[in-house]
Amino acid sequence: FIDFASGLPTIEHIHEVAPEGTKVIYSDIDPVTVAYAQEIIGDNENVKYVQCDAAKPEGVLDSGIVEEMFGNNRKVAIGFNGISWFLTSDEVNHAMSVLYNWSGDDSKLFISEGDNPETPEKAEKLRQFYENVGQPIFYKPMEEFAALIQPWNIAEPGMKKLEEWLEMSTEVSETIEKDWQGVGAIYGGFLAK
């Protein structure tokens, strides 16, 4: 398993919930996060944490760590969760192409994407919030996003709102709709090679 923009591997991260012996490579762009994560992981031989910009996944793929962990096996699961709206369209397309060309047949990739907010005012408010914290966001309509992730194929059940895809309760879905009404939905799904 290769995961991008992993954050800190605290509770129920991939290496804790995957079958025993699963090899996991986490990555993040932030060197402080990487340093703390390496301390958390400790000497677990099945888990590595490296610095990498998700917009340039070749940073992990060409580092030697993948061959060390997986050998020649390129049938992998890839996590690209909560990243794409922080990348330009060109960066998303580049990352998806690199990962597709590198991965073996039957590989899977989990991805999520935020749809455009319903009104220009709400879009600007959300954009300004992220700009103020130093992390610009780039809205992509779902039709454009579908083109950017090619040649990956969207697997069943397709890109769905996360609260539907994760089968959250109706109460949770209603709360999300109420609290986030008009700021756009977050969709998630699996891509298959």
Residue ranges and their predicted role:
Residues F1-A55:
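SAM cofactor-binding core of SAM-dependent methyltransferases
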Residues A55, I83-F86, G114-E118:
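Short "lid" loop at the C-terminus of a central beta-strand within the Rossmann-like core
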Residues P57-D62, F86-L99:
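A short, conserved alpha-helix within the catalytic core of class I
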Residues F70-S84:
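Short SAM/SAH-binding signature in class I
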Residues V76-F80, A95-N116:
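Conserved beta-strand signature within the Rossmann-like core of class I S-adenosyl-L-methionine
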Residues T119-V133:
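Short, glycine-/aromatic-enriched active-site segment of Class I SAM-dependent methyltransferases
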Residues P136-M159:
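Short alpha-helix
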Residues W165-K193:
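Core SAM-dependent methyltransferase catalytic element
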